[in-house]
Each structure stands twice: as structure tokens, then as C-alpha cells.
Amino acid sequence: MAAFIAKQMVGNQLSAVKGAVGGDGGDDGDDKEKAEEEERERQEAIKEAEDRRKEKHRKMEEEREKMRQDIRDKYNIKKKEEIVEAAPQEEPNPLMRKKKTPEELAAEAEQEELDDFTKLKNQIETQVNELKTQIEGKCVMQ
């Protein structure tokens, strides 16, 4: 490892000295083109390696899932997803419930307010009707 690092350091310095001593000005354009081409090739190689890795991973997952399904079939085991779906229906957890947005809370408060208003209105109407019947009962017209 140390040899590699030393070689890189000395190699870079040696390249700089060669460029300064040689004085070739035309090579800079070629060097840039070569560097760009090498960078493109490197990026393509990285992409190909990543694609191969993903494909290998996908194949392994398919094989694992097939093996899991064979075991499930052999021992008559249901998939976990089916079991998980049945559990929340039995006993809802209040800590895991959906949180209400401020808009929902405002709508609920408005609904409660309307309910209170309706209750008060009905209460007042019943009291007025009771008073009306009491007054009519006391004042009998002949």
C-alpha cells in the first residue's frame, strides 16, 4: 500500500516536470480529450458493473422467494403479509392511529359548534313552546 502511494506521488511530480521541461503546448488539448474519453469509459464501466450487480441481486432474490414459497407450501404456512393484515382489524392501537390535520380539527370544531348551536336553538324553542302552552292554559278565552 505504501509503495502504491509513493509511486503515485512520485509519478505525479515526474509528470509535472516532464510537461514543464518538454514545453509541448499542443498536447494539452489532446490530454483533455484523452482525459474526457477515459472519464466516459470509466463512467460506462461503473454503470455496467452496477447493472450486473443489480441483476445478480434480483436473481438471488427471485431464488430466495421461490425457496421461501416452497417452504410455505410444504408446511402450509401463510405469508406474513396476510397475517399482518388481519391483526389491525382485531384490536386498533390508539398510538398508531392516523393523526388529524389542522384542517380536519377545524372542521370537527365547526361541526361541534354547529351541534351546540342546534342544541341551544332546540332548547330555546321548546322552552318558548312550553311557556306559550302555559300562558294559553291560564288565559282561557270564552
UniProtKB/Swiss-Prot annotation:
Q: Name one GO biological process term.
A: regulation of synaptic vesicle fusion to presynaptic active zone membrane
Annotated membrane topology is: Lipid-anchor
Instruction: Quote the biased-composition stretches of kind Basic and acidic residues, using this chain's numbering.
Output: 31-70
Q: Which InterPro entries match?
A: Synaphin (IPR008849)
What does the protein in this record do?
Positively regulates a late step in synaptic vesicle exocytosis.
**Subunit structure, interactors included:** Binds to the SNARE core complex containing Snap25, synaptobrevin and Syx1A.
* The protein, known as: Complexin
Q: Which organism is it from?
A: Drosophila melanogaster (Fruit fly)
